[in-house]
A protein has these predicted regions:
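Conserved small/polar residues in nucleotide/adenosyl-binding loops
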Residues: 168-174
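Cell wall/extracellular polymer interaction/catalysis modules
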Residues: 1-150, 164-165
Length: 178
């Protein structure tokens, strides 16, 4: 039976991958909070293996940390990923040339630009743009849980705990493509 999270994804009109082993459904669920610097979102990784559904659930952030909200990397403001389905845009690579992650190389992603340098996450429709921004999916600390997002995200989707993500589940199947 298809997992409930995939039913919700399908109900929103998005494609759900149901055929084949390790055909990953990577689902980021943003919390309703607009407060920054917290790992208060959820990422589900759902796939089939030998006709059995496998589901993982991890605490993440889908939002930039406070450091980058106050110190944007560019003059247009800090990136916040817009809700949507981004099929085929990630592949296994290195985040900032340092460690294994899913990197945005296969297509554009839509973002909001938060320009006002406060602690509130702004999702202003007038700031929406799409492009290649290096919005990756990666871990925070290598050693422990990170309590705050801080410098771990300038717009990337970041796992709170590196140990929670056995990158075997996330990266081995992606040697093909997500």
């Amino acid at each position: 039976m298809i997992p409930n999270i995939l039913k919700e994804v399908a109900d929103r009109g998005y494609v759900v991958f149901t055929k084949g082993d390790y055909n990953l459904n990577i689902i980021g669920v943003r919390s309703k909070s607009i407060e920054s610097n917290k790992f208060d979102d959820t990422m589900y990784i759902v796939f089939k293996q030998n006709d059995t559904w496998i589901q993982f659930k991890f605490p993440i952030t889908t939002d930039p940390g406070l450091y980058y909200l106050n110190n944007p990397m560019g003059v247009n403001g800090t990136a916040i990923v817009c809700e949507g389905q981004y099929r085929g845009i990630y592949k296994l690579g290195l985040h900032r040339g340092s460690y294994e992650a899913l990197v945005q190389t296969g297509g554009k992603i839509k973002i909001y630009r938060d320009r006002n340098k406060d602690e509130i996450l702004d999702h202003e429709p007038t700031s929406l743009i799409d492009g290649y921004f290096g919005i990756n999916i990666h871990r925070a600390s290598t050693r422990t849980n990170s309590n705050n997002v801080d410098k771990w995200s300038a717009g990337c989707q970041v796992f709170q705990n590196a140990y929670a993500v056995s990158y075997t589940h996330l990266t081995l199947p992606t040697k093909r493509i997500v």
